[in-house]
Amino acid sequence: MNYYGNYYGGLGYGYGGFDDLGYGYGCGCGSFRRLGYGGGYGGYGYGSGFGGYGYRSCRPSCYGGYGFSGFY
């Protein structure tokens, strides 16, 4: 439940990201079909990239993602 899952490259494990790694708290445009607290392209749940919050918020990078995304 880290607020800084993986901002920038999907280095996080189980936190999804640019490389769609695992699932959970994703960030930025990269988490494809990430359920739960994902984000990015097609990801729905909480979080996402550029201040995206709610469902299906596709924003590049992970700057101030609302919820559990990026390093808010």
From Swiss-Prot:
Record's Gene Ontology CC terms? cytosol; intermediate filament
Q: Which UniProt keywords apply?
A: Keratin, Repeat
Matching InterPro entries: KRTAP_type8/19/20/21/22, KRTAP_type_19
Q: Which Pfam families match?
A: KRTAP (PF11759)
Subunit structure, as described in the record: Interacts with hair keratins.
The protein's job, in short, is: In the hair cortex, hair keratin intermediate filaments are embedded in an interfilamentous matrix, consisting of hair keratin-associated proteins (KRTAP), which are essential for the formation of a rigid and resistant hair shaft through their extensive disulfide bond cross-linking with abundant cysteine residues of hair keratins. The matrix proteins include the high-sulfur and high-glycine-tyrosine keratins.
What family does the database annotate?
A: Belongs to the KRTAP type 19 family.
Query: What is this protein identified as?
Result: Keratin-associated protein 19-5
> Organism, per UniProt?
Homo sapiens (Human)
Source taxonomy:
Eukaryota, Metazoa, Chordata, Craniata, Vertebrata
Coding gene?
A: KRTAP19-5
